[in-house]
């Protein structure tokens, strides 16, 4: 049995993860963490299911006793702090937060030298299949096709572009032998001249209640290939995170992603 702690347990993602962990074979919810205001409430009741006998606390350190894995959907600042605490306690970690700064990523990487960490910009199984499709398409189509990425999310999303859009650009750039730092273009405005052939554009849209949509365009002469993933609910992100928790328990220290969880890396 894998003992799981969920951070952000009263949020939209957290409540879904609590429900899925409670229903999952081989997993047991042993801790739930949320900001002050929810402490003492039963995690199951907060998630809309029968009580689980797990009281919400407002400090991760107080929930780690006996834990095997923490599933973290908070913020990049909180996730970096939580990674350091999990490393101190020897508890594996699944991170689904986005919007990481280079400094926060470095803190997570340092923690992964001591514990196993699944760190992925998107926990959806479908999106991770999209990563592989983009990699293969870029290799086959090569420099003869221009690559552009468009993402749209709900108006409350704080970071832009999405971590998934950036990752898609990095995947395409890597497959084409380009440095993402040079190739990815996030802003276009004014008279810029002809599009550089090495460039990969990443465009952001925000509005309404869109859960998430990503399209990668491969634009050639006389044809265009579009690869799209549309999320219609957040449940697929939660399902991926719970799957990652079952995968990472007992693994050696290191930085893993959903390609490892889904066995996609070994299939390349």
Curated annotation (Swiss-Prot):
Q: What class of enzyme is it?
A: oxidoreductase
What Pfam families does the entry give? DapB_C, DapB_N
Q: Name one GO molecular function term.
A: NAD binding
- Residues bound to NAD(+) are 8-13, 34, 96-98, 120-123
Q: What catalytic activity is recorded? A: (S)-2,3,4,5-tetrahydrodipicolinate + NAD(+) + H2O = (2S,4S)-4-hydroxy-2,3,4,5-tetrahydrodipicolinate + NADH + H(+); (S)-2,3,4,5-tetrahydrodipicolinate + NADP(+) + H2O = (2S,4S)-4-hydroxy-2,3,4,5-tetrahydrodipicolinate + NADPH + H(+)
* GO terms under cellular component: cytosol
State its Enzyme Commission number(s).
1.17.1.8
The positions flagged as active site in the entry are 153 (proton donor/acceptor), 157 (proton donor)
Subcellular location(s): the record lists:
Cytoplasm
Its principal location? cytoplasm
Query: Where on the tree of life does the source sit, at the highest rank?
Result: Bacteria
Instruction: State the pathway, as annotated in the record.
Output: Amino-acid biosynthesis; L-lysine biosynthesis via DAP pathway; (S)-tetrahydrodipicolinate from L-aspartate: step 4/4
Keywords on this record? Amino-acid biosynthesis, Cytoplasm, Diaminopimelate biosynthesis, Lysine biosynthesis, NAD, NADP, Oxidoreductase
What does the entry list as the binding residues for (S)-2,3,4,5-tetrahydrodipicolinate?
154, 163-164
Q: Where does NADP(+) bind?
A: 35
Q: Which GO terms describe its biological process?
A: diaminopimelate biosynthetic process; lysine biosynthetic process via diaminopimelate
Summary of the function given for this chain in its UniProt record: Catalyzes the conversion of 4-hydroxy-tetrahydrodipicolinate (HTPA) to tetrahydrodipicolinate.
The text of the family note is: Belongs to the DapB family.
Protein name as annotated: 4-hydroxy-tetrahydrodipicolinate reductase
Its ancestry begins with: Bacteria, Pseudomonadati, Myxococcota, Myxococcia, Myxococcales
* Gene from which this protein is expressed: dapB
């Amino acid at each position: 049995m894998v003992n799981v702690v969920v951070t952000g347990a009263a949020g939209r993602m957290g409540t879904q993860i609590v429900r899925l962990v409670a229903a999952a074979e081989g997993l047991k919810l042993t801790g739930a963490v949320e900001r002050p205001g929810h402490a003492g409430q039963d995690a199951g009741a907060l998630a809309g299911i029968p009580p689980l006998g797990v009281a919400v606390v407002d400090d991760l350190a107080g929930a780690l006793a006996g834990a095997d894995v923490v599933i973290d959907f908070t913020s990049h600042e909180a996730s970096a702090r939580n990674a350091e605490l999990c490393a101190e306690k020897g508890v594996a970690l699944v991170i689904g937060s986005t919007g990481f700064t280079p400094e926060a990523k470095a803190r997570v990487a340092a923690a992964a030298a001591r514990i196993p960490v699944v760190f992925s910009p998107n926990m959806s199984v479908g999106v991770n299949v999209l990563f592989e499709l983009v990699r293969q398409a870029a290799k086959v189509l090569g420099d003869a096709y221009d690559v552009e990425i468009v993402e749209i999310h709900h108006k409350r999303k704080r970071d832009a572009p999405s971590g998934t859009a950036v990752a898609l650009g990095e995947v395409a750039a890597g497959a084409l032998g380009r440095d993402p730092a040079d190739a990815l273009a996030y802003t276009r405005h004014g008279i810029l001249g002809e599009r550089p052939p090495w460039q990969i554009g990443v465009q952001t849209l925000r509005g309404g209640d869109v859960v998430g949509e990503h399209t990668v365009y491969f634009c050639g002469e006389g044809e265009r290939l579009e690869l799209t993933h549309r999320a219609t609910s957040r449940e697929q992100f939660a399902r991926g995170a719970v799957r990652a928790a079952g995968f990472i328990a007992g693994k050696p220290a290191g930085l893993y992603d959903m390609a490892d969880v889904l066995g996609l890396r070994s299939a390349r």
